Each structure stands twice: as C-alpha cells, then as structure tokens.
Design a protein with these regions (language model features):
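Residues that define the transmembrane beta-barrel architecture of outer-membrane proteins
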Residues: 22-24, 41-45, 84-88, 120-124, ...
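Transmembrane beta-strands of outer-membrane beta-barrel pores
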Residues: 30-36, 65-71, 108-114, 132-134, ...
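Short glycine/proline- and aromatic-enriched beta-strand/turn motifs that initiate or cap beta-hairpins
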Residues: 19-61, 151-155, 159-161
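Repeated loop/turn-to-beta-strand initiation elements of outer-membrane beta-barrel proteins
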Residues: 23-24, 57-61, 101-104, 132-139
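Helix-adjacent hinge/juxtasegments
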Residues: 67-104
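Cleavable N-terminal export/targeting peptides
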Residues: 1-23
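Transmembrane beta-barrel domains of outer membrane proteins
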Residues: 50-52, 93-95, 127-131, 138, ...
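Mid-chain, well-packed structural core segment of small domains
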Residues: 97-118
Length: 162
C-alpha cells in the first residue's frame, strides 16, 4: 500500500511540473544593452506572450509574440531626441524541461521594426530559467540582427503561466 501511495505521489508531482511548462505564458523582462547598442542605449524592456504545447516528454514548442524596446541615451546624440528602437518579435519558441523545475530553450523568428526607418531583422533569444509552478524566473539574451548592425541585451525576466 505504501508503495502504491508513493508511486501515485511521484506521478502527480511529475504531471504538475510538466503542466507548469505548457499552456499560455505571459512574461516581462528588462535588460542591459550589449554590443552595438551598449554605448547608445540605457536599458531594454520587453513583454511576450507564448502558447506552449507538449510534443514529447519534457519538450515544449509553440508560437510567441512580443514587444521589445531599447531606450536610447539622448546624451550620446548631442542632446537631440532620438526615437527608441521598438520591435514586435514573432517567433517559434522551444523549451526543454530539466529535473527540479529548471529549463532551457530558445525563441527564433523575425522582429518587425515599429519605427520609421526600422526594417526589423532576424530575432533570437536563448534562455534558461527555473519554474516555481505557475511563476518562472528567466535569464536570457535578446538578439536582433538588422542590416548594418545588431541590437542585443542580457535580460532578467519573470513569466506567469495562465
């Protein structure tokens, strides 16, 4: 009887961890610009919405859409007001769940430029995190490759499973 109770408990715990990865996820992140943007941008902020589906044991994929903005430092432009580059990333998202709530994954797609003269570019965001049930903490790198340069930031974020 004890063995049966233990087996059922472990099965329920595993189902809870697997269920925490799938479904609708809403996230927000802030980051420090790196690379081409390091000298001209103060910080980056973004939000995203993803729907993750379990396709195999501990493997999740789904569509993701978001909003990312790099806040420009006007002092570096002689005091002139400069539009903050903003993007609408549309991507495929994938994650691999590891033991004890840890996961890693990536988003790959295209970031649509939302400003005049901002044509957008290839979007990628590798990430690693830890899920506390319906809430997760994520460390990531956001990269957007555009003609003539790139936008990049190292981020820390939180996401909520709905």
């Amino acid at each position: 009887m004890k063995r049966l109770v233990l087996i059922v408990c472990f099965m329920l715990m595993g189902a809870t961890v697997m269920q925490a990865q799938s479904g609708l996820r809403v996230g927000a992140n802030i980051g420090l610009p790196v690379g081409d943007m390091e000298e001209v941008s103060n910080f980056q902020a973004g939000v995203d919405l993803a729907y993750m589906l379990s396709v195999a044991d501990m493997l999740y994929v789904g569509p993701m859409v978001g909003y990312t903005r790099f806040f420009m430092d006007e002092d570096n432009f002689g005091g002139f007001e400069v539009d903050d580059p903003a993007f609408l990333p549309i991507a495929a998202s994938g994650r691999v769940a590891l033991a004890e709530g840890f996961f890693f994954g990536t988003d790959l797609g295209y970031a649509v430029g939302l400003n005049d003269g901002n044509d957008g570019g290839f979007y990628y965001r590798p990430q690693a995190g830890y899920n506390f049930g319906k809430i997760g903490l994520i460390a990531s790198y956001t990269g957007i490759s555009v003609d003539g340069g790139s936008f990049g930031s190292i981020n820390l974020g939180i996401e909520f499973g709905l």
